[in-house]
From Swiss-Prot:
The keyword Oxidoreductase does not apply. Keywords: ANK repeat, Repeat. Pfam families: Ank (PF00023), Ank_2 (PF12796). InterPro entries: Ankyrin_rpt (IPR002110), Ankyrin_rpt-contain_sf (IPR036770). ANK repeats lie at residues 33-62, 157-186, 218-247, 251-281, 285-314, 316-345, 347-375, 378-407. Gene3D superfamilies: Ankyrin repeat-containing domain. This is Putative ankyrin repeat protein FPV115.
Amino acid sequence: MDGRCLHNIMYTGTYDEIMRAINIYEHRNYSSFRNLPLHYAIYSRRKDIVETLLKSGYDPNSVDITDNNCLQLLSMPFDITMLPVDEEVQDYAISFYLSKNMKHTSMLIPITKEALRGNRYPSEPYFSSMCRKFKDNELCIMDLLLRYGALPNSRKDGLLPLYHAAAAGNTEMVELLLSYGAKTNLHTRYEDSIFMCAIKSNNVKTAKIISDLYNYKNDINNILKTIQLYNADMLLFLIEIGLDINTKDKKGKTALHYACNSINCIETVKEIMKYGADINVKDREGLTPLHSACKYGDLKLSKLLIEYGADVKVKTTSTVLNLAVESGNVELVKFLIEKNPEFITSDYLSLSLAIRCKDINIVLLLLDAGMDVNSSKCISTPLHLGVILGNSNIVKLLLDHGANINAIDKYGETPLEAANKRINIDYAELYKSNRFIIKYLVFLSRYDYKIKNNIGFIKNMYIIDKDETLSCFRNMCETELDKISSIKIGQYSLYSLLASDNDVKEYICKNRQEITQKIIDNLKDIIIYRSFIEKYISRINI
């Protein structure tokens, strides 16, 4: 008999069938994996078989092929794929287990056995009795192993049995291991203490047993970092044993900071606030919990924190709006601006960040809210950034909102000049951005004669003149503008209407429909400046 057959029969066979299988295995494979029958019996929770094998000399401290000893096999999370059943039964067992909100994964064994018997919907009293018997059976197996000499503090790999039991919130198993001398001052490979394992289980009874033997203050940093894992009862327990909810770790962060760093933390935050958490506490970087919420783009959490009194105007290395912009949550950005309209005039960095993130929706939101499209408080203007970072759609958007194409940055370069000096750039996007800029440049030069004396304009024209492709497109723009200027709309040219419709408002108001139709009739050969004209038509017909 091979190991797989022996494993399967442990779950389905009678005592006699299993012992016959073990006898066959011992005669054929005993020298290779001497204690394998004991490991299988433990993992399948066959107390009767475990007791028989221990009496016959099987080693309670032996390890299996995964380097786990007998106590570890009994206390570690159960792997349902070890059960000799098909996927349909496995899926049922997992679904039923989750529906009961159970914490001990080994309960999958009796659930599966009941399913194989055809009892997939046991009554509540029957199910409760079944669980109680199974749990008692597990404890009896552990007691047998310990009485036959299993060492509670021994391991070759993995977690100690006490840590597995504490992490599962298995209070009875924890008590049994402690009674046999299990140590509480060791740590896991992840530096978790026994106390951390216990509180993560959210079983207050288990945590209390460990806390009586261990100083929780040794784990204060880890407790804060994992605060989002604890339910209301566990949080109350931590407060009762002395945890100050405003305690800071080495980074200056509190429990509220860490809670706001995680997803689905609304309820945790509400619980923390019950115990007097400082809503505007700053860490060593000057960041508040609201900064954390905005960093992860959590609109619901941000609203909750502000309801509790979080200061949206708090000054630090980054504003909450900066972080919200980087998160990409348009609704959060909109909400913060509504809460603090001063962001529009004081937070010049957010527009640059939105451009860096290439988030056209947030760029549009900030521009429509009134943020300065020509802000020069950074090294470069927003238009410089848009061109250099290679996003022609954002470049067009900035130009449509009045970006100054002749602006000079701190290095003395215009957007066109700066972008065309770059080597590491998306040339397809640069090509489109160049055309947008030249289109606006040529249009402006037609009606603003003073612009020709502007140093930025001179620089731009120099860049265009020395590049054959750019010069060619400029000439195309000039030709199309000549055509637009030749189109007569009443006593005005179409170009004069586009360039200065404020001067002819009365004429436009009286002849709106006629003007619109006349323009539409002449759109056929207009390509480069078609968007200008369509925008003009929309504007006069509002």
